[in-house]
Design a protein with these regions (language model features):
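Conserved H-loop
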Residues: 38, 128-132, 160
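Conserved Lys-Pro-Asp/Glu-containing loop-to-beta segment of HAD-superfamily phosphomonoesterases
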Residues: 8, 146-175
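A short, structured active-site edge motif that brings together acidic residues
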Residues: 128-143
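Substrate-recognition element of Asp-dependent hydrolases with the DxDx(T/V) motif
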Residues: 28, 96-122
Length: 191
């Protein structure tokens, strides 16, 4: 049995700490309606949860780069006012973060969500005090891939030994991003 004790824990946000289904899918529906694409069932848009938005709009709707950029702007128009709060905290999240902090582990956020939105969500759920650092994507797309976000968190903190670090997330992007940065990962199955 592995008795390894990690000192630095990176968490994904959407699908790992929170259930953002209504907010994200409603924001995607709003963006798609701009292109006269109507969606009846929000659950059909769940694949948008996790990956970078540009990738999703291009993969799922064959948008060009330009169309995807417009869709992202429309998505953020809705999300920044309403979708950000159409979100629920998974049961036990607050207690888990409290216990990790009490056991002197440092907690970081590494999310594909734009950093200001991620910070707002942590504040909305009163979780911000648990986090040593919050890392997210940028609005200009210069840091949108999960591997880049993880690298940003590692570069922006005092983490010296990568073997002391683990990334916890619910999507392949979290696991692949951790691997690209030579850190361990743990996948959750409930997100």
């Amino acid at each position: 049995m592995n008795n390894k004790r990690y000192q630095h824990i990176l968490f994904d946000l959407d699908g790992t700490l929170t259930d953002p289904m209504i907010g994200i899918t409603s924001s995607v529906k709003y963006a798609l309606s701009y292109f006269n694409i109507e969606v009846e069932d929000l659950r059909s848009l769940c694949p948008f949860i996790g990956p970078p938005l540009k990738t999703s709009f291009k993969d799922f709707y064959q948008f060009t780069d330009e169309q995807a950029d417009v869709a992202i702007a429309k998505y953020r128009e809705y999300f920044s006012k309403q979708g950000i709060f159409e979100n629920t905290l998974y049961q036990g999240t607050d207690e888990l973060l409290r216990l990790l902090t009490e056991n002197e582990m440092k907690i970081y956020l590494a999310t594909s969500k734009p950093q200001p939105f991620a910070q707002q969500i942590l504040e909305y759920f009163h979780l911000e005090s648990y986090f040593t650092f919050v890392g997210g994507s940028t609005f200009d797309g210069s840091r949108s891939e999960k591997a880049d976000v993880i690298q940003y968190v590692l570069d922006s903190t005092d983490i010296k030994t990568r073997s002391d670090v683990v990334m916890i997330g619910d999507r392949k992007y979290d696991i692949e991003g951790a691997k690209a940065n030579n850190i361990d990962s743990i996948g959750v199955l409930y997100g």
